[in-house]
Amino acid sequence: MKYLTIGLGILAVLLCLSLVFSLLSVRYLREIEAPLREAESFLAAGDFDAIRSLTADARDRWDEHLGFFSSLLSHGELDEVSNDFASLSAYAALEELPDYCAAHARLCTMLAHLRDIDQLRYYNFLCSIVNQFENKG
């Protein structure tokens, strides 16, 4: 009985940590996306000073939370977001509006995807369980 109680306690702690990390991940990704969404309003006017500033702000927020995301995301996902930020900064510096818009859309889509993966939804748990059974079979 003692081992069952200890096991359930450990399981409860792990579940709580999983929920906390999931909520923090979604919060941090929204903080990173906010300046990028704000930069969209300056695209039509072509105000690259504001665009560069907002892009740098988003990149700083990503860098600030990089240690946290390194513990949750795969290296491929981290590299993809970092490369997208580098492309976005380069296009903003060169004032290449079409390329900036394409890179901006790609980065926003990637961040939204990462946010959706970590949101607490029943099918995120079910997909994980199904994948575990498929990999064993």
PLM regions with names:
Residues Q119-G137:
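Cytosol-/stroma-facing membrane-proximal "stalk/adaptor" domains immediately downstream
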Residues M1-T5:
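Positively charged n-region of N-terminal signal peptides that target proteins for export
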Residues S25-F42:
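Alpha-helical transmembrane signal-anchor/signal-peptide segments
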Residues I6-V20:
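Hydrophobic membrane-insertion alpha-helices, especially the h-region
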Residues D49-Y91:
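Extracytoplasmic/periplasmic/luminal assembly and interaction segments
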Residues C16-L17, A39, H65, L88:
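Alpha-helical transmembrane segments of multipass membrane proteins
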Residues A39, L43-A50, A92-E96:
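Short helix-adjacent coil turns
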